[in-house]
């Protein structure tokens, strides 16, 4: 069922039906919160509906939660901190 929801949500997105894509992918994430692929495809839909900040925040969180790359993990704390602060300017 996870794959079916991902496929349907992705298809809606590629057809420009972002409302149904959002609905299907959010349902998938609710039912299968550990499925990172659903979350990544959801970030694509967020991007398409101009929710760039939400898309980037979720994508960064998925990245640091799933990577084994030591160079990224060295900066995990900073990536998590800045994930929802991309528009902030520090003075």
Task: Please identify what each model-predicted range represents.
Residues 22-24, 34-48, 62:
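A contiguous pocket-lining binding segment that forms or flanks enzyme active sites
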Residues 20-28, 56-62, 90-91:
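Alpha-helical repeat scaffolds
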Residues 46-70, 80:
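TPR/TPR-like (Sel1-like) alpha-helical repeat modules
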Residues 26-34, 64-69:
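Solenoid-like repeat scaffolds
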Residues 1-30:
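Alpha-helical adaptor scaffolds
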Residues 14, 48, 82-85:
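Register position in tetratricopeptide repeats
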């Amino acid at each position: 069922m996870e794959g079916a929801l991902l496929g349907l949500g992705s298809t809606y997105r590629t057809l420009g039906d972002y409302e149904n894509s959002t609905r299907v992918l959010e349902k998938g994430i609710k039912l299968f919160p550990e499925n990172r692929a659903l979350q990544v495809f959801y970030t694509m839909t967020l991007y398409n509906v101009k929710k760039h900040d939400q898309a980037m925040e979720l994508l960064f969180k998925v990245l640091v939660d799933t990577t084994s790359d030591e160079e990224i993990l060295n900066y995990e704390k900073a990536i998590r901190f800045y994930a929802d602060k991309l528009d902030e300017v520090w003075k």
